[in-house]
């Protein structure tokens, strides 16, 4: 089983398939040797039950594998032998370093086997939790920094090597945990300042907050910068003046929007000390050109000569009040989203609605300002940059009151102006035999001094020589040296050997040299190296489909006849007798990736040279979505992907046949091609329509794709109880009801057993929002995706298995909503009800919806009103009870409802026009009622009362049956709430056992009084209760 070099005999195959089948979990990893041979096995028709051997798996083979072991074992061994020569092994020495709360740095070394064949690496990372998705990052380079991780979370990662012919198995999995981050309390207004790695910016006396922020959390372990609460700043100014004994006539000047009058000149220092709040405002004072003797008002000791500096008061006020004006906060999350050799796209997070422009500044590495640009969107693209150069950028938000503090700098380096992997050394050239004694052969080559991008190598080059006995071995032998020659020893006499060499600088390995064949025979020289020339000579090696090319393979002028075979894709040409060259003229097509020229003689010796060709793919452009549904004031992203057809395509978007004017373009080059995204912020009705992604290549060819943006303004449900009420009405019960509930944990994919409710779930999940992205991530098949986007759908398609996933995505879209309202206040008067409520201060777009209907009437429709104010007036019937629900909403969804009630008037109001006689009788009735109430109050003092009177006044005069008043604490929480337990209402005053007391109040039912106490039935309506909402 372990001797892969030879195919097993028929008898051995039977034994392996039966007796030895249980040993495969031990053998498979060994013979796979860190490489994945599955692709080859599939091409050779190996059955599914035996593919575990090809992938080096440790899984046991099932009973059904007996057949494929008998039929496919030889094919499996052939693929494994082939993979030894063409597949790299897994990356080695994978290590984790430089952990933060949101990032990790990964390093690795080249594979132990076939490192020269590696073209790129792929990183796989996921949270170490059940059901978490795997993030795939292609073309990573060691060391690699992976960003966007969650703090205080455990992750697992592996790496995979890729060559042109296959891949390795994943490397040994690495487990690590990101660092925790302390989330500070929420600021009164806005959010604290965060660093680029997600940590909060710490402030103290040495590191003060920028203008517009104050250092809070004093006395705790964490002090951070929060935006100034402008509603309290002047109050603090005034209180400071009072404490400093400011004269009453000057107190009106202790406001940030006031200056100090001349009559208060002698109190200038008191005004300065309170207005400055002890902060250093020197930078602002210098900008305002405050005279040097008067600058001590802007910094310690905050005292100035009043006569000399009183004229500077207006400048002081400008600086002191700047921190309390509604200036923009610092721009957050500045990122360099795409980088090329001469351009870079900068994006950031726009959190405020009143920004009029962003100032974007570009700096050189030394800090010199190069460019200053203005952007009305939260993205900007710098062009005409220098290749392979370090830059930094920062962004400042500006509104009508002024500019906020600058963001943190984001640094980046433009790409070199060379071809892919230009930092690798070039392949060694002119590999040849220096001398040959038979068992020992000296081979030499020209030294490598430059990289593929023409830069000079700066570190020592290590050469690796590979040689293989073509007849008796399948394993390459390697030798390493820092010289440009090496002696291969102990060769088998008269044997043929393949030999090639690679160069390595640090961890970057070149492509292989040409391959020569050596005959281990005394004084047997090698063959000359062929030279391949391709016309036209594209420096980047990229050719267009259908382009006419000429490939020439030639030898130096020698007198010996040699055979020359030139192979390009499916084309093979040979030289004429005695000719030292061969030419192939053809058109470039997709089958061409390498030009191979082999020179051979009659002794079996060869010298093989190769040259790689890169072919452009046929131009195509596709839209990510054919239809995009958006809501009023929502942002939309129209994405198209362009593949092939030109090195520098021009990509633009059109709307209804004209160039799109509202929005901005974000372009990014990826391994798959170009990804273009057209962003439109705060969509309006006029933005709806058909959008085209138009791509024009350098040769003038044009391709395009279309997508429709569908606009909708209705975001509120007809029924305020939303999805949950629909599910309850449809009879969905048990755990399946959790999928309908906003804020609850949805069912995991493994536990879905709700197919009996599938039709009902899909009905209630119907929504105008587009949930396609969520559904795709949840594994919903393409045939069922129309249910996620509100499109037309064929009832003949069965989507019951995806019902819970579709419902979960529908619910998630509603969770991205404003927070709920609080402190609802109701004031009723003469048939009108005024309702007010509180809502957190925010600059985000929102409005409120108020639902109301008569209580205790489930058949009456809800009435719905919308407002942008935090109050509303309703016309209601004063003789009816009403239930009211209020929610906050925006384009992303709406909050949970806050319920309340409007009680009816205790007595209908009478008209005031009935005259004085009506007033007289009202007074008489009130006097009679007063006398009656007073009499009942006197009677109630007596311990024993006749039954009718006692029942009438509701007395419970049994001292052993105490009473209690309670209200339902879950009122207004229709989806849940705490239970309430009422203890101590039952039993007598005598001492009972603990068990008896426990069982007495734990009963879940309302329990009537003892049947033996009929004479006092009115006194003891219930003994105790446990209520569950």
Curated annotation (Swiss-Prot):
Q: Which positions form S-S bridges?
A: 640-693
> What processes does the entry annotate via GO biological process terms?
sarcomere organization
Please give the residue ranges the record annotates as the region Disordered: 988-1021
Sequence ranges assigned to domain WR1 in this UniProt record: 185-227
The portions of this protein that span the membrane are 919-939
Task: State where the protein is found.
Answer: Cell membrane
Please tell me whether the keyword Glycoprotein is annotated for this protein: yes
**Domain Fibronectin type-III: residue ranges:** 90-181, 330-417, 427-523, 817-909
Q: Which Pfam families match?
A: DB, fn3, ig
Question: Where are the compositionally biased (Polar residues) regions?
Answer: 998-1013
| Residues carrying a glycan | 36, 93, 120, 165, 257, 374, 409, 442, 482, 507, 552, 753
Q: Which residues form the signal peptide?
A: 1-22
Q: Name one GO cellular component term.
A: M band
Q: Which SMART domains match?
A: FN3, IG, IGc2, WR1
Q: Which residues lie on this side of the membrane: Cytoplasmic?
A: 940-1029
Q: How does it sit in the membrane?
A: Single-pass type I membrane protein
Q: Which InterPro entries match?
A: Cys_repeat_1, DB, FN3_dom, FN3_sf, Ig-like_dom, Ig-like_dom_sf, Ig-like_fold, Ig_sub
Which UniProt keywords are listed? Cell membrane, Disulfide bond, Glycoprotein, Immunoglobulin domain, Membrane, Repeat, Signal, Transmembrane, Transmembrane helix
Extracellular topological segments: 23-918
Residue limits of the Ig-like C2-type domain? 619-710
| Record PANTHER family | CYTOKINE RECEPTOR (PTHR46957:SF3)
From the Swiss-Prot or TrEMBL record, give the protein name. Answer: Ig-like and fibronectin type-III domain-containing protein 1
Q: Which gene encodes it?
A: igdb-1
